[in-house]
Amino acid sequence: MGNDARVRVLVADDDPVILRLIEVNLGLEGFEVETATGGEDVIAKAGQVEPDVILLDVMMPGVTGWEAAARLKADDATAHIPLVFLSARTQEEDKRKGEELGVAAYVSKPFDPIELVATIRRLAGRA
């Protein structure tokens, strides 16, 4: 737990129940968690919060995870931050699209908390 105390994760999901579930799970593992309720919110917070990793739901109303990822990767201030798609969309074409956008990992919903934590640790260089 001590190793992860400084790992800051920004989580974006439009479902408040899933957002809280992720926040609690990651908090129990010692991560510092910030939340965003949608695509515009995550883009606005990413530059302020300076997270080590960003988790993005793909299917959010308004600015989708796809669009948010593209905008985050196009911005010099946030382009270096590893992105993880967290989505029920598991088709290979979705995973390929994520790779093309520069997304570092794709975790399927319903997610396994152990897999999610391991992915974040790996991307934050704390594996």
Regions found by a protein language model. Give the residues of each.
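Short, glycine/charged-rich "phosphate-handling" switch motifs in NTP-dependent
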Residues: 104
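Active-site residues of response regulator receiver
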Residues: 57, 87
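Charged docking surfaces used in two-component/phosphorelay signaling
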Residues: 20-28
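Receiver (REC) domain active-site loop signature in two-component systems and cognate sites
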Residues: 60
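Short hydrophobic/Thr-rich beta-strand motif most characteristic of the beta2 strand and flanking loop
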Residues: 30-37, 45
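Active-site beta3 strand of CheY-like receiver
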Residues: 49-55
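C-terminal output helix
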Residues: 111-121
